[in-house]
Amino acid sequence: MSQSARELVANVRHELAAVLPERPCCREAELDALRDSGRRSDVATARTVHQLSGDSLVIAASGTPRELALRRATMLAARRAPQHCRSAFLRGRILARGSLSFARGGSHLELVLARAEAIVLAQAFAHVGFPGQLRERRGRGRSE
């Protein structure tokens, strides 16, 4: 990836991380998305987690971060789910598990997820006008 492409990706991540939801329900949705970050760590995401969790009442939920993300994704993929919470969760999943790739044919967003969550998240993205494809890479589920 060229230097300008890396800078663009970093700028997009920083812009997404700068959006702080006003509603408590949206903050909790985004936190659920960010808690399961895999091996990724960057300053923008860490700052967002700190800002979102600093002023909210965190209620202990049972399950691993991956299980909590799948539960939240399932709730927000429902057609009647609040759009504001769905957007906050999707933004968090992009920050936590997303990568932006550039090729000759254009650009695409990839999310590295467990297959169960990828299927549910594809529905949630479709509800906000971003239909995607599910692909399995290297034996792991991946949603584009």
Language model: regions and residue ranges:
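DNA-contacting interfaces and partner/effector-binding or oligomerization modules
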Residues: 30, 37-144
